[in-house]
Swiss-Prot record:
Protein purpose: One of the components on the FinOP fertility inhibition complex, which inhibits the expression of traJ gene, which in turn regulates the expression of some 20 transfer genes. The transfer genes are responsible for the process, called conjugal transfer, in which DNA is transmitted from one bacterial host to another. RNA-binding that interacts with the traJ mRNA and its antisense RNA, finP, stabilizing finP against endonucleolytic degradation and facilitating sense-antisense RNA recognition.
Species, as recorded: Escherichia coli
Gene giving rise to this polypeptide: finO
Family: Belongs to the FinO family.
Keywords from the UniProt entry: Conjugation, Plasmid, Repressor, RNA-binding, Transcription, Transcription regulation
InterPro entries: Fertility_inhibition_FinO_N, ProQ/FinO, ProQ/FinO_sf
Single annotated GO MF: RNA binding
Taxonomic path: Bacteria, Pseudomonadati, Pseudomonadota, Gammaproteobacteria, Enterobacterales
Region: Disordered, residue numbers: 1-20
Xref: Pfam families: FinO_N, ProQ
Name of the protein: Fertility inhibition protein
Length: 186
């Protein structure tokens, strides 16, 4: 039995291929940054976006503040209609005579009409600057007094002026809507 050589198991075996020998330590570059750094960057980006949005909203709020806060057309009509029904055709305002504000202020001063000058002025501005009022200003249309009687007719110059005003008001309304959209976004 001694003649037969049995294979002996060893723990250290020689590999058949050659392994490269390292002469130095290799440097491994990690491509992903640590989680804390990623979180910090995201928070910084979010804070920058929020600051930019806040600045944009503040600028929009400041730009929106230059426009008058007039009541709506319905509120203005409901303010004036109980005391001067001749100025309205149903719920739509008629074209007002020139100098009607002074006449209305005089009526408020002499009568028992509980309207302040400011409220009356704002209601008249809301009516005369409305799109429906300016669209109705065509050459030959009638202007009415407080009793509902015709006083004069619209001239060509007044019609041209109304068209300019209408363009300006539509442009302002478009700008206002854009600014309001900026304020409403989150």
């Amino acid at each position: 039995m001694t003649e037969q050589k049995r294979p002996v198991l060893t723990l250290k075996r020689k590999t058949e291929g050659e392994t490269p020998v390292r002469s130095r330590k290799t440097i491994i570059n990690v491509t992903t940054p640590p989680k804390w750094k990623v979180k910090k960057q995201k928070l910084a980006e979010k804070a920058a976006r929020e600051a930019e949005l806040a600045a944009k909203k503040a600028q929009a709020r400041q730009a929106l503040s230059i426009y008058l806060n007039l009541p709506s057309l319905d509120e203005a009509v409901n303010t004036l209609k109980p005391w001067w029904p001749g100025l309205f055709d149903g719920d739509t305002p008629r074209l007002l005579a020139c100098g009607i504000r002074d006449v209305l202020l005089e009526d408020v001063a002499h009568g028992n009409i509980p309207l302040s000058h400011k409220k009356l002025r704002r209601a008249l501005k809301a009516i005369t600057r409305s799109e429906s009022y300016l669209c109705a200003m065509k050459a030959g249309a009638c202007r009415y007094d407080t009793e509902g009687y015709v006083t004069e007719h619209i001239s060509q110059e007044e019609e041209a002026y109304a068209a300019e005003r209408l363009d300006k008001i539509r442009r302002q309304n478009r700008i206002k809507a854009e600014l309001q959209a900026v304020l409403d976004e989150k």
